[in-house]
Amino acid sequence: MTTTFIKAVEIWVPTANRTKLTLKTGHYGELDYFERISRGMQFAYDEGLPGKCWAAGHPLMLKDLGNSYFKRGEEAMTVGLTSATAIPHFVGNDLAAVTVLFCGDNAHHVGAIELWHAPAGDPQMALYDGYFGRAEKFEFSARHTQFSRKVG
């Protein structure tokens, strides 16, 4: 069996009246318990990770699922999830979906996920946020790297 750093993926979409997000689809691998918990949930604007991502209008990352606004923190930690990254998708100004990537690392596997950003008018893109788990050298390198336009 192959073990990957990304353990689960969810796609949340607005309800017909656009007041909440509902789970459209998800891939949970062997995380049946977490899938069952997730299937019945909905998130209002600015609620939980999908809702907060909707409100922020840009990707968000949680590196501690148990001590945050993450609604399924205890369940996530029970199945070995260590971080979550939410990415909004827009059509014009309207939210089309929020993708949530769940990651998990342990003593035998190392992985990282990064969010990069270049502020308007800034020619350099730099690390905005990242979860590196045990990849300390990689984290140091990422935090001290910038990319010019069309480079990297």
Question: Residues of each region from the PLM?
Answer:
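Interdomain signal-transducing alpha-helices
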Residues: 57, 93, 116-119
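Flexible loop/coil segments at beta-strand boundaries within sensory signal-transduction domains
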Residues: 90-95, 107
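Short hydrophobic/aromatic beta-strand element in the GNAT-like acyltransferase core
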Residues: 8, 86, 98
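A short, aliphatic-rich beta-strand micro-motif
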Residues: 82-90
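Regulatory sensory and allosteric helical modules in signal-transduction proteins
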Residues: 17-71, 123-152
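Short beta-strand-to-loop transition segments that serve as allosteric relay/switch motifs
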Residues: 98-106
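Short loop/turn motifs at secondary-structure junctions and domain boundaries
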Residues: 41-44, 75-81
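Short N-terminal helix-loop-first-beta-strand/juxtamembrane motif that initiates sensory/input modules
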Residues: 2-13, 109-124
